[in-house]
Amino acid sequence: MIVGRHIIAELYGVKEELIAKEEVVRSIVEEVVDKAELTKVGSVYKQFNPHGVTGIVLIAESHVSIHTWPEYGLVNLDIFTCGDTSKVEKAFKLFLEKFKPESYRHYVLDRG
């Protein structure tokens, strides 16, 4: 029995200006959640000094989290839904469009 889909991804070679500041990361994540038609319940973001961001969006279907390391051009993403699994794929594609990584690797897990 499959109850959800989980994508874990590492994006490499992301431009620093896209991932260094909380307000930019927040804007991208919130837009992706909205466009992927995920049901946002709440969110928390943390700006690190001198740069880097962690954010978690609680969605009714599960969660989306992001961790950034601008000094390495690195973004770690975690997207999980126990709802419509196509929304996870849509969210991941939107993140790729927004962050434009030079390369990435990702794992797709069917949960359950």
Curated annotation (Swiss-Prot):
Class in the EC hierarchy, top level: lyase
Reactions performed catalytically: S-adenosyl-L-methionine + H(+) = S-adenosyl 3-(methylsulfanyl)propylamine + CO2
GO biological process, one term: spermidine biosynthetic process
InterPro entries: AdoMetDC_fam_prok (IPR003826), S-AdoMet_deCO2ase_core (IPR016067), S-AdoMet_deCOase_pro-enz (IPR017716)
Active site: 62, 67, 82
Family according to the record: Belongs to the prokaryotic AdoMetDC family. Type 1 subfamily.
UniProt protein name: S-adenosylmethionine decarboxylase proenzyme
Gene name of the record: speH
